[in-house]
C-alpha cells in the first residue's frame, strides 16, 4: 500500500485568473479547431464538444441537431445495424462526419462495428468504450480495431493516468477518453472507491497524450459552461457532455408527465435502469454503478448548446484567447474555496 500526497483537483477547486485581452467582443473568438490524427492521418474540423454515448443523450436526433453547430455526437451502441442503415440513408457527410460509432469489446461488437462502418465511407470515428480502461483486453482490442480500420479515427477509454494514455495511443488509439467516476449519474466512486478528480486527470493525461502526438477527450464532470472551459484550459482537446445535454427533445427516451410538469429519464450506462433495458438485469456478480433521475424537460438542444458555446467564448475573452486552441496557453488556474454566491440559489 502507498499514499500519494499530492492533492488532485476537480473543476470546483479552481477558477481562471483573468488576463489582459485585445478582444473587443465574444464574436471575435474562434471555437473551431482543426486536428490531424496520429494513426489514421485523418483531418477533422469543428467545435470539439461531444455528446456522450449514453442512450439518453447520444441519439441519432442529437447527432443531426448538434452537427448544425459543428459539434460531434458519440452515438450510443444500442442501435442496430438496420437503424444505422436508415440514419446513413437520411443524412449527408456533414452529419456522418460528426457521428462516432460506439462499440464494446466483444467479438459480436467487433462484427457489428464492421457492418456499420461498411455502410458508408462518411463514418470516420470509432469510439471503443468500456468503464475500466485499465484492462489488457482493451489494449488488445484497440490493436485489433486499428488493424481492421487503418484509416479511421479511433477513440478508446476510459482511463485517468498518463501511463495508460500512452499505452492506448501506442496500441493504435488516436484519441483517449479520460474520466472515471465524475459523471452526474455515475456512482463508480461511491460503489468502488476508485476514481480521480477530473481536472487533474485531464491535465496529466493531456501532457502524456500530446507528447506522443495523441489527443484526449475530457469525459464527465461538467455541470456548467465554466467547467467545459476549465476542461479545455486544462488541456483537453475534446470535452464530452452527458447530463448537460440530457433532458432535451433530441436526447431520446420518453417524456414523462408528473403533476402537470414534463420530465425525461436520464440514467448512467452502468445503472440498474440501463442493465434492465439492455442486459436483462444486473448480473449476480456485479453491482449497479449508476443512478436514474428525472430531469425537467428542456425542449430543443439548440438553445443549450448555444449557451454552452457562448460561455466558452466568454472565458476566452476574459483570458485573452482569440482562438480556442490558445486557451490552454492563456490559462492560469487559481485554487479557491468558493465558486459563486448562492444567496438566491445555485445557477
From Swiss-Prot:
Residues the record marks as active site: 186
Query: Signal sequence: where?
Result: none
- Listed binding positions for NADP(+) are 108-131, 216-239
What's the Enzyme Commission number for this chain? Answer: 1.7.1.7
Q: Which PROSITE patterns match?
A: IMP_DH_GMP_RED
Question: MF terms per GO, please?
Answer: GMP reductase activity; metal ion binding
Query: One biological-process term from Gene Ontology?
Result: purine nucleotide metabolic process
| Residues involved in K(+) binding | 181, 183
Gene3D superfamilies tied to this protein: Aldolase class I
Tell me the enzyme class.
oxidoreductase
| Catalysed reactions, as listed in the record | IMP + NH4(+) + NADP(+) = GMP + NADPH + 2 H(+)
Q: What top-level branch of life does the organism fall under?
A: Bacteria
Q: What SUPFAM superfamilies does the record tag this protein with?
A: Inosine monophosphate dehydrogenase (IMPDH)
Q: Name one GO cellular component term.
A: cytosol
Swiss-Prot/TrEMBL keywords? Metal-binding, NADP, Oxidoreductase, Potassium
Query: Which Pfam families does the record associate with it?
Result: IMPDH (PF00478)
* Keyword Oxidoreductase attached: yes
**What does the UniProt function comment say about this protein?**
Catalyzes the irreversible NADPH-dependent deamination of GMP to IMP. It functions in the conversion of nucleobase, nucleoside and nucleotide derivatives of G to A nucleotides, and in maintaining the intracellular balance of A and G nucleotides.
Q: How does it assemble?
A: Homotetramer.
Provide the protein name. GMP reductase
What organism is the protein native to? Aliivibrio salmonicida (strain LFI1238) (Vibrio salmonicida (strain LFI1238))
Q: Which gene encodes it?
A: guaC
Amino acid at each position: 500500500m502507498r499514499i500519494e500526497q499530492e492533492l488532485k483537483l476537480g473543476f470546483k477547486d479552481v477558477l481562471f485568473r483573468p488576463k489582459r485581452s485585445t478582444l473587443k467582443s465574444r464574436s471575435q473568438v474562434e471555437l473551431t479547431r482543426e486536428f490531424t490524427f496520429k494513426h489514421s492521418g485523418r483531418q477533422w474540423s469543428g467545435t470539439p464538444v461531444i455528446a456522450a454515448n449514453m442512450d439518453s443523450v447520444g441519439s441519432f436526433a442529437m447527432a443531426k441537431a448538434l452537427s448544425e453547430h459543428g459539434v460531434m455526437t458519440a452515438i450510443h451502441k444500442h442501435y442496430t445495424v438496420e437503424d444505422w442503415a436508415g440514419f446513413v440513408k437520411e443524412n449527408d457527410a456533414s452529419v456522418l462526419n460528426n457521428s462516432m460509432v460506439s462499440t464494446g469489446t466483444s467479438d459480436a461488437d467487433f462484427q457489428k462495428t464492421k457492418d456499420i462502418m461498411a455502410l458508408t465511407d462518411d463514418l470516420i470515428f470509432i469510439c471503443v468504450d468500456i468503464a475500466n480502461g485499465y484492462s489488457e483486453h482493451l489494449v488488445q482490442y484497440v490493436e485489433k480495431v486499428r488493424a481492421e480500420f487503418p484509416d479511421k479515427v479511433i477513440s478508446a477509454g476510459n482511463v485517468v493516468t498518463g501511463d495508460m494514455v500512452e499505452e492506448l495511443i501506442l496500441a493504435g488509439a488516436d484519441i483517449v477518453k479520460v474520466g472515471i467516476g465524475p459523471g452526474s449519474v455515475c456512482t463508480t466512486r461511491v460503489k468502488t472507491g476508485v476514481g480521480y478528480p477530473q481536472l487533474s486527470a485531464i491535465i496529466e493525461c493531456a501532457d502524456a497524450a500530446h507528447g506522443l502526438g495523441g489527443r484526449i477527450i475530457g469525459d464527465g464532470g461538467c455541470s456548467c459552461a465554466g467547467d467545459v472551459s476549465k476542461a479545455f484550459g486544462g488541456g483537453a482537446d475534446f470535452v464530452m457532455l452527458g447530463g448537460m445535454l440530457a433532458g432535451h427533445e433530441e436526447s431520446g427516451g420518453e417524456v414523462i408527465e408528473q403533476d402537470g410538469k414534463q420530465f425525461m429519464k436520464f440514467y448512467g450506462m452502468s445503472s440498474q435502469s440501463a442493465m434492465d433495458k439492455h442486459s436483462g438485469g444486473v448480473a449476480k456478480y456485479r453491482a449497479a454503478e449508476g443512478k436514474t433521475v428525472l430531469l425537467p424537460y428542456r425542449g430543443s438542444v439548440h438553445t443549450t448548446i448555444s449557451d454552452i458555446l457562448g460561455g466558452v467564448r466568454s472565458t476566452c475573452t476574459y483570458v485573452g484567447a482569440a482562438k480556442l486552441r490558445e486557451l490552454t496557453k492563456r490559462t492560469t488556474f487559481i485554487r479557491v474555496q468558493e465558486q459563486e454566491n448562492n444567496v438566491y440559489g445555485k445557477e
